[in-house]
Regions:
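Intrinsically disordered, low-complexity regulatory regions enriched in serine/threonine/proline
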Residues: 55, 62-148
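Compact, well-ordered interaction domains used in eukaryotic information-processing assemblies
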Residues: 11-61
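A short, surface-exposed helix-loop junction/capping segment
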Residues: 1-6
Length: 148
């Protein structure tokens, strides 16, 4: 069947679309980057004084892609080549996923379905530099998930 977004072709195009969308929404600052050590890609933007930091894991997507497309000795190339391809696919796919997620959130805000804070609360950065969700998790403010 394949994974959603596995055939996405341009991470740069998705980044440009996100930037254009957020600028039209009224954001003052926009940045993207990559943590080579963790394989995480990020988008950061500021809206009305609130800094938002969105992260996505190219490695996480690559792992899912490898489950969907396991390496076989019948394939051209080595296992390392196949894993490198998975990471490349993941790097493009996660920006497309972020683009669609941000578009959904911005649309929900614009039509009055939710507020900016409701849409992005867990990703808003606190003055300490950690996100709201990271702070909540560190303080153990949420009950543990049930095993049901």
């Amino acid at each position: 069947m394949g994974l959603p977004y596995e055939n996405a072709t341009s991470g740069d195009k998705a980044i440009g679309e996100i930037q254009k969308m957020l600028r039209a929404f009224g954001c003052q600052r926009f940045a993207t980057g990559e943590d080579y050590e963790t394989g995480e890609l990020f988008i950061q933007f500021e809206h009305r004084g609130r800094m938002v930091h969105l992260k996505a894991s190219a490695r996480g997507y690559a792992a899912a892609w490898l489950k969907e497309h396991p390496y076989s000795t019948r394939m051209r190339g080595t296992r390392a080549d196949h894993e490198a391809k998975a990471l490349k696919v993941g790097g493009v796919a996660v920006y497309s996923i972020l683009r669609d997620w941000v578009k959904g959130q911005v649309t929900a805000i614009e039509i009055g379905m939710m507020t900016f804070e409701a849409a992005f609360l867990s990703h808003i950065l606190l003055p300490s530099g950690v996100s709201v969700i990271e702070h909540i998790q560190a303080q153990k403010m949420l009950p543990a998930p049930s095993n049901a």
